[in-house]
Amino acid sequence: MLFLLFLLITPIYAGLIFLTKPSNDPFYNPPKGFEKAAVGDILQSRETPKSITGRFAPLEIQNSWQLLVRSEDSFGNPNAIVTTVIQPFNADPSKVASYQVFEDSAKGDCAPSYALQFGSDLSTLATQAETFLLAPLLEQGYYVVSPDYEGPKSTFTIGKQSGQAVLNSIRAALKSGKITNIKDDAKVVMWGYSGGSLASGWAAALQPSYAPELGGNLLGAALGGFVTNITATAQAADGTVFAGIVANALGGVANEYPEFKSILQSDTDKKSVFDEFDSHCLADGVIDYINTSFLTGDNKIFKTGWDILKSSTIAKIVKDNGLVYQKQLVPKIPIFVYHGSIDQIVPIVNVKKTYQNWCEGGISSLEFAEDGTNGHLTETVVGAPAALTWIIDRFNGKQTVSGCQHDKRLSNFQYPNISSSILKYFKVALDTMMSNGLGSDIQKDKITPDDLRKFLLGGW
């Protein structure tokens, strides 16, 4: 009942709460001379202006901060990103989970640092819903760090920008002890699903060369709905109910590569199309572009269609930002991949190719949990307890698989030793609805098995 009441009043109440958007917030602007700072340095910090919450899951936590962090774009040009640090009750300062949300937008005002706060636009609904994945991490007593990995230009799908931002966010978190109490030798696990897996995967692959000093901190990365080929995802989504992802991706690439934008603009009669591509978050983008064909069919917006990939400029951009093509980049940390066999948005074939590349490259530990009955959307939920099990095992010092291991199950709910994590996952979701505090060993309203049963069966 509390949850239903929350759903009813939140849109009204949130409309009365003024939360400055990143485009109008001076905090997002780096100070003069920031270029001289080292990547990962904290340029400025503050407590989050509003509480961390999802429209469906208000988070009762100890504290939260925003750090403005020195980073750089795909070409090595200095920039600054904001990362959000969330502290649960009774937090363990030696354990940090870097969670990369699936922002999937080319619009700066959709950034996680904004979307995760109370009072953010309804258009950021997808990010707000991801608090269900953040909450179980907080419940374990882990600090959660969530970076605006797309950077100030909102470069959705761009690999180096995203991966470097994740690593620089972690660097900053480990330097933030005087602000957050996180230890500089804290252990860190990365996690991301879909668009968040793109950023997390690139971070894992770049870490040995870009941030070798983090090798002693990083325990591994969990990658779900793993995006390794942005073209394959665009081809799968174009002309479908998920065509908005294509629009947002085109906008994100154009934000990093002006030449990409010029080539596509010359291939359409709709010259203002790119003005629209960077004006949506994920949720409203999907709604506004349902069944739109950008590069497919007779009524496509871009005349050349998929033959546009024959342009050497376009082909290079696509290859540079597809992790599946980067055989030379092999993670040195343990990796857990979970993916649905029938994923219709992120085809599993490219995940298998990346798995093969990394195995042939000598990766020390790569576990691939293939779910035989779930697609992209359902695996978000079904695969989460498996990822949580794997993450908890990493922090508890349990042994990872040696070498490469690919297991296909009917469902990832059948992942080994997952039962307690399934209970934790859904119990914490219920905790958030009841506004119970999140953290290790804290007093809460008692949740009975009957409460959990009602929640799972939709009886609330």
Swiss-Prot record:
Similarity comment: family membership: Belongs to the AB hydrolase superfamily. Lipase family. Class Lip subfamily.
Its domain of life reads Eukaryota
What is the recorded function of this protein according to its Swiss-Prot or TrEMBL entry? Secreted lipase that is able to hydrolyze both the neutral triacylglycerols and the monopalmitate ester Tween 40, allowing the use of hydrolyzed products as carbon sources. Acts as an important virulence factor in mouse infection models. Has broad lipolytic activity, which may be important for colonization and subsequent infection, therefore contributing to the persistence and virulence in human tissue.
Known catalytic reactions:
a triacylglycerol + H2O = a diacylglycerol + a fatty acid + H(+)
From which residue to which does the signal peptide run? 1-14
Its Enzyme Commission number(s) read 3.1.1.3
Q: What organism is recorded for this protein?
A: Candida albicans (strain SC5314 / ATCC MYA-2876)
| Protein name, per record | Lipase 8
Name the gene.
LIP8
PANTHER family in the cross-refs: LIPASE 5 (PTHR34853:SF1), PTHR34853
Q: Give the disulfide map.
A: C110-C281, C359-C404
